[in-house]
Amino acid sequence: MPVLMSPEIANKFKEKWLMLHPEDQDNVSGSVHFDDSLTSLHWLQNFSILSANPERTPSSGCHPQHLFYYKNQLGGTDSPSSPPAGDTAATGMPQTPGNPTTSCSSLANPYALQQAGHYITGQTNPAEEIDYKTNRHVKPPYSYATLICMAMQASNKTKITLSAIYSWITENFCYYRYAEPSWQNSIRHNLSLNKCFMKVPRQKDEPGKGGFWQIDPQYADMFVNGVFKRRRMPATNFNTQRQSKMLSSPSSSYTSQCNQQMGMGHFQGNKRKQVFPKRGNKLARISKSPLLTSDIKTSDVLRGDFDLASVFDDVLSGNDSTFEDLDINTALSSLGCEMEPSSQIHNQSGYSNEDEQACAYLEANGIIGCNMEDFHHQQHHQQAQVHPQYYEGMFSDQQNQQHPWEIKEEAQPVPLSLDHGYAFCEGFFSEMQLWERGESYM
């Protein structure tokens, strides 16, 4: 088998190609111009939106005679080459990189276009005012609420019927005259649902059927110069609503009241006759919610922790004199809080009021920063003079009460036997607790 060189292979391939495609006999020299206008996008790089004519409609194009005129005027600059004969796919597409032929304004400068303005027939005139009263093909650019307001103002009456609104719209807008009657349902829905319109019942002495409609006076300013404007909620309105919700809650009202009274106490100095909300009122206010009733005892237990935190804040902020007062304040505040349930047991009104005042003063002292040593001596002196029997009985009850963890079990003697037999082991294991036995781990 002979070995063929590349030129011979090319000649054989050319002969076979011409045998299969006899229409290519005229282009033997290889001067065939392949049209790549369908895939070329070089014109898109040079295209500019600023050079395009915005007033010209997309469907309007340039006549071939106009293109020929521009070619003669400008000397063929940026003008596309004519497509080959019979090539319908390349019509209107550029053969060389450049601007597309569909835009007439991109083919010449403004001066040349001004000279050749009388040859251009594809451009439309500027938008003229549309007469909606006679044009049945263009829908008016007004909302249904605006149409209702326009009908009410055109009637020069305080109230108007629904049929009068229909008749005014069909009389002034030809589009609704020939359109489907579904727009009447939209008019009725706007009258019923829009808060700017209100229905006025018909009086007994007025003839006819149905009620009247009018614009709500508080929303009359929304219809200005034929345009129905919607009100926007100001940014401050949200803040005021949020503040009102926060102030309406019981906890926030209680804290605001305490802050106000603490500020008054700070200016009054060390006066002990300070009025504070009672603890019973606070517990009653919290117990109104059924979900929080189980948390009342827990809050009483954790009250000492919160008092300790407030004392630390006061010491660090400089309200108390030294850190030595910290232990005194903590002890007195915890003592005052524990005195409250004991006063409820005795059911003595005079004693409970005195105890609550002492607790309130102790809490105020932890926040305001009064001298605790002076108060401790005065309070002890008053207790000795006013109610000595009451306080003695109260503290005697506290001394008699013992906590569960303070109760100690008496050690019971275990009978031991000198016999190291089975009896000794049995007696030893019988006295062991349940968690000490080996059976509990099995």
Curated annotation (Swiss-Prot):
Keywords from the UniProt entry: Activator, Cilium biogenesis/degradation, DNA-binding, Nucleus, Transcription, Transcription regulation
Subcellular location: Nucleus
The keyword Ligase is annotated on this UniProt entry: no
Positions with biased composition (Polar residues): 93-106
PROSITE patterns: FORK_HEAD_1, FORK_HEAD_2, FORK_HEAD_3
Phenotype of null mutants: Randomization of the left-right body.
Chain residue ranges for the region called Disordered: 73-106
A Pfam family per the record: Forkhead
Record has Nucleus as a keyword: yes
GO molecular function, one term: DNA-binding transcription factor activity, RNA polymerase II-specific
Signal peptide span: none
UniProt cross-references to Gene3D superfamilies, sorted A to Z: Winged helix-like DNA-binding domain superfamily/Winged helix DNA-binding domain
Main location: nucleus
DNA-binding region: 139-233
Gene Ontology BP terms: auditory receptor cell stereocilium organization; cilium assembly; determination of left/right symmetry; heart jogging; heart looping; motile cilium assembly; regulation of transcription by RNA polymerase II
GO CC terms of this entry: nucleus
Described purpose of this protein according to its UniProt entry: Key transcription factor required for motile ciliogenesis. Activates genes essential for motile cilia formation and function.
Alphabetized PANTHER family for the sequence: FORKHEAD BOX PROTEIN J1, FORKHEAD BOX PROTEIN J1-B
Family: Belongs to the FOXJ1 family.
Protein name: Forkhead box protein J1-B
Gene source species: Danio rerio
Gene name per UniProt: foxj1b
